[in-house]
A protein has these predicted regions:
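Non-catalytic interaction/Regulatory regions outside core domains
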Residues: 1-100
């Protein structure tokens, strides 16, 4: 998957693909951000939502005080993106939908 398409967007901190059990398959993160923790969190969120809501595919956007997290379940695994809260969220969503 072309992660650099996402990570080239200003204020995107990183992107990656995780397995359903939270292991990193592929990632590109800036220095100081942990791909392993993000992958584990993404897998936990997807698994919890699937279990609670009994649905097939999951796509989630979390807004926090300083960051935005995108999580989308794909054929290749669980795709996740972390960015600053003032990143171009619309552009990030468009790029995610193009490559997943």
């Amino acid at each position: 998957m072309k992660l650099d398409t996402i990570t080239k967007i200003p204020k995107v901190l990183g992107a990656g693909i995780a397995s359903t059990d939270g292991f990193v398959i592929e990632s590109q993160f800036t220095v100081g951000y942990n791909a392993e923790k993000s992958a584990a969190m993404a897998a936990q969120v997807v698994n919890r939502i699937k279990q609670s809501l009994n649905i097939e595919k999951v796509s989630v956007i979390f807004y926090t005080q300083n960051s935005v997290f995108f999580i989308k379940e794909t054929e290749a695994g669980i795709f996740f993106v972390t960015c600053h809260k003032d990143a171009n969220i619309g552009l990030v969503k468009i790029k995610i939908n193009k490559i997943t």
